[in-house]
């Protein structure tokens, strides 16, 4: 199974990759926000996000919908009831976060005058860290560097200036100990 993910469904590099995999015999799935897109037409199956029109350059709404859709696919394909239960709790968790907008705004003030920020993750959270780094660059024009938290401890940490914001994305899995070590440093 090959899954192509694109907000517009028109990303040429993703479409060409999906096309090549289909020609090679793979079952293809397109995950897009547009049912009439070239990727949707090409793939054996299409999952339409229905996230609505994406107006922000950073495409945060679509990215969130893509991650949720992929997690739901994994949960269903693997029969992981714990993951399904966790995913069902996501809407309530988001509503709870939205209720903390003042605290979030205060935390964001740390980035107001920061010329740079470091964004760390490990394992499954590394991809999210990379995406958040990109979002900060696109929306705040803050220069960011992204590293695996394990890699960060072996060199890059030496270049970290005092007062530079560091965002660490951690999950409750085998990578948690490494992330705790980074926080301790």
PLM regions and their residue ranges:
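Anionic-ligand anchoring segments at beta-strand to alpha-helix junctions in alpha/beta enzyme folds, i.e.
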Residues: 1-2, 115-162
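Glycine-rich phosphate-binding loops that contact phosphosugars or nucleotide phosphates
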Residues: 1-90, 169-185
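Solvent-exposed alpha-helices and their adjacent loops that cap or buttress functional pockets
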Residues: 21-23, 38-41, 109-112, 158-161
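Residues at the starts of beta-strands that form the adenosine-phosphate
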Residues: 26-28, 116, 165
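Short, structured loop/turn "capping" segments at alpha-beta junctions
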Residues: 80-84, 104, 142-143
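Cofactor-pocket helix-loop regions in the catalytic cores of large enzyme subunits
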Residues: 86-121
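A general structural motif
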Residues: 96-103, 144-154, 175
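Generic recognition of flexible, low-complexity loop/linker segments
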Residues: 105-108, 154-157, 182
């Amino acid at each position: 199974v090959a899954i192509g993910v694109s907000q517009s469904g028109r990303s040429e590099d993703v479409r060409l990759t999906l096309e090549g995999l289909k020609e090679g015999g793979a079952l293809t799935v397109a995950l897009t926000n547009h049912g009439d897109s070239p990727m949707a037409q090409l793939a054996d199956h299409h999952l339409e996000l229905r996230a609505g029109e994406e107006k922000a350059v950073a495409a945060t709404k679509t990215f969130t919908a893509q991650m949720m859709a992929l997690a739901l696919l994994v949960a269903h394909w693997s029969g992981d009831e714990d993951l399904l239960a966790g995913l069902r709790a996501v809407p309530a968790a988001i509503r709870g976060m939205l209720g903390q907008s003042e605290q979030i705004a205060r935390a964001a003030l740390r980035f107001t005058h920061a010329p740079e920020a470091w964004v760390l993750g490990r394992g499954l959270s590394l991809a999210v860290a990379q995406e958040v780094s990109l979002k900060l660059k696109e929306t705040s024009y803050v220069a960011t560097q992204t590293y695996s938290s394990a890699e960060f401890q072996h060199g890059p940490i030496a270049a970290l200036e005092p007062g530079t914001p560091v965002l660490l994305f951690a999950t409750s899995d085998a990578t948690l100990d490494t992330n705790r070590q980074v926080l301790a440093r």
